[in-house]
């Protein structure tokens, strides 16, 4: 199995709900290591740039507004098949359709405020990690 890195964002609803620790525990319990982390309050430019691929979609403005409504926690997770594992832990985009025990089922209130973001492919992970982190902000954890 391949060791991968993926980007995770704990969104404003989950940060505001005081769920950071519980969400981090889920990552670590699944064998993912946190190798980079920071709390940010995104502005329109940073959030809009991150979600630029959705610019023409009808939900884009609401998404940017939500992502700038409060602090987020961006993290780089590392582990075997980290991308798929992280997506499994997150659950379906719509919390109403998410499996029991997933982050979205337990901490999200709607498809619009769904607690977390995760990279959907190796290409996305590489691009998204570079968007928020410089090389020296992502650390090797050998211990």
Swiss-Prot record:
Binding-site list for ATP: 11, 59, 87, 93, 104, 114
Family: Belongs to the NDK family.
Subunit structure: Homotetramer.
Its biological purpose: Major role in the synthesis of nucleoside triphosphates other than ATP. The ATP gamma phosphate is transferred to the NDP beta phosphate via a ping-pong mechanism, using a phosphorylated active-site intermediate.
PANTHER family named among the record's database cross-references: NUCLEOSIDE DIPHOSPHATE KINASE
Record carries keyword Phosphoprotein: yes
Location(s), subcellular: Cytoplasm
InterPro entries the record matches: NDK-like_dom (IPR034907), NDK-like_dom_sf (IPR036850), Nucleoside_diP_kinase (IPR001564)
Keyword Nucleotide-binding listed: yes
Taxonomic source organism: Psychrobacter sp. (strain PRwf-1)
GO MF term set: ATP binding; metal ion binding; nucleoside diphosphate kinase activity
Keywords tagged on the record: ATP-binding, Cytoplasm, Kinase, Magnesium, Metal-binding, Nucleotide metabolism, Nucleotide-binding, Phosphoprotein, Transferase
Gene Ontology BP annotations: CTP biosynthetic process; GTP biosynthetic process; UTP biosynthetic process
UniProt catalytic activity: a 2'-deoxyribonucleoside 5'-diphosphate + ATP = a 2'-deoxyribonucleoside 5'-triphosphate + ADP; a ribonucleoside 5'-diphosphate + ATP = a ribonucleoside 5'-triphosphate + ADP
Positions of the catalytic residues: 117
One annotated Gene Ontology cellular component of this protein: cytoplasm
SMART domains: NDK
Name of the molecule in the record: Nucleoside diphosphate kinase
SUPFAM superfamilies: Nucleoside diphosphate kinase, NDK
EC number of the protein: 2.7.4.6
